[in-house]
Amino acid sequence: MEKYNVKEYIELLKQEDILKETIDCEKIMDKQVDLVSYNSKEVQENTLFVVKGALFKNEYLKEAIDNGVFVYVSENKFDVDIPCILVTDIRKALSCMSAMYFNYPGESLNVIGVGGTKGKSTTTYYIKAILDEYSKAMNKKDTAVISSIDTYDGVENFESHITTPESYDIHRHFANALKSGMENLVMEVSSQSLKIERVADVFFDIGIFTVTYCPLSRL
């Protein structure tokens, strides 16, 4: 997988018009980023860390630094002695940097998104079943799925606990599906995920909106 340096991530944030300021980054501009992460417990050497969440604490970042973080991206500066990249929208930053880190895998997949108040899961699995039958007949890999029921990408297969995962995890699943030789992926897209930029850098080949009228559905 192609790796990028700090300068290239900063340029990306500039292009997205969300870069606010860089602090003490001059000497690390050419340093390669081996991992982008938003989980302080899942970092390694040469990690660019994305600070998100209103409840994030300074000690979480210090723990991450001890484990290999050398620069962080945040909406606010923390009391730590490493370079930082300040942005105006951390969720958008996580989304675009995640897509770049995984080398935009969604662009090489046929991605189908299913949104709507009711029927997202049912519609998603109908589509997966149809595509799986086609793939079987053509001697191709089955269809990846991201849903509120479970997630399957050819590498990971687990029961889901959320309808649409964080943007970083979406692009990780895309990368896994591509690595596994899959061509198609169908996913549920919640209204919340649209609101908080989780799918901001997902380019859907097909978008489906389910409409089921029920006067009590929002009560």
Residue ranges and their predicted role:
Residues 1-96, 100:
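N-terminal leader/targeting and accessory segments in enzymes
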Residues 94-219:
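Phosphate-binding loop of NTP-binding sites
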